[in-house]
């Protein structure tokens, strides 16, 4: 399982490895369940990262549109 400081990209690669091993190997049930659990935890972390990024993008977009409108209003006067 990746550490908390790993990047989004490294977590995606780790998730891909887990999925690949589960698709291509005959794993004992215990190992398959461990891989599944690790994959679900990674998905949750990745989802949280994406949601946080989406929130930042929305905030920046809204602020940018407001600033753009203000700048446009000052040119019209």
UniProtKB/Swiss-Prot annotation:
Domain of life, source organism: Bacteria
- Asked whether the UniProt record includes Nuclease among its keywords, one would answer yes
- Keyword presence, Nuclease: yes
Name where it mostly resides. Answer: cytoplasm
The coiled-coil regions, if any, are: none
Catalytic activity entry: Exonucleolytic cleavage in either 5'- to 3'- or 3'- to 5'-direction to yield nucleoside 5'-phosphates
Cited InterPro entries: Exonuc_VII_S, Exonuc_VII_ssu_sf
Q: Name one GO molecular function term.
A: exodeoxyribonuclease VII activity
Provide GO CC annotations from the record. Answer: cytosol; exodeoxyribonuclease VII complex
Question: What EC number(s) has UniProt assigned to this enzyme?
Answer: 3.1.11.6
Q: What is one process in the GO biological process aspect for this record?
A: DNA catabolic process
Compartments in which it is found: Cytoplasm
**What UniProt keywords apply to this chain's record, in alphabetical order?**
Cytoplasm, Exonuclease, Hydrolase, Nuclease
On subunit structure and binding partners, the annotation says: Heterooligomer composed of large and small subunits.
What family is it from?
A: Belongs to the XseB family.
Function of this protein? Bidirectionally degrades single-stranded DNA into large acid-insoluble oligonucleotides, which are then degraded further into small acid-soluble oligonucleotides.
Protein known as: Exodeoxyribonuclease 7 small subunit
Per the UniProt record, the source organism is Clostridium acetobutylicum (strain ATCC 824 / DSM 792 / JCM 1419 / IAM 19013 / LMG 5710 / NBRC 13948 / NRRL B-527 / VKM B-1787 / 2291 / W)
Gene giving rise to this polypeptide: xseB
């Amino acid at each position: 399982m990746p550490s908390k400081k790993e990047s989004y990209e490294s977590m995606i690669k780790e998730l891909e490895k887990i999925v690949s091993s589960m698709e291509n190997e005959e794993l004992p049930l215990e190992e398959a369940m461990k891989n599944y659990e690790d994959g679900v935890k990674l998905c949750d972390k990745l989802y949280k990262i994406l949601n946080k990024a989406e929130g930042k993008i929305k905030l920046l977009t809204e602020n940018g549109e407001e600033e753009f409108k203000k700048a446009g209003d000052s040119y019209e006067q």
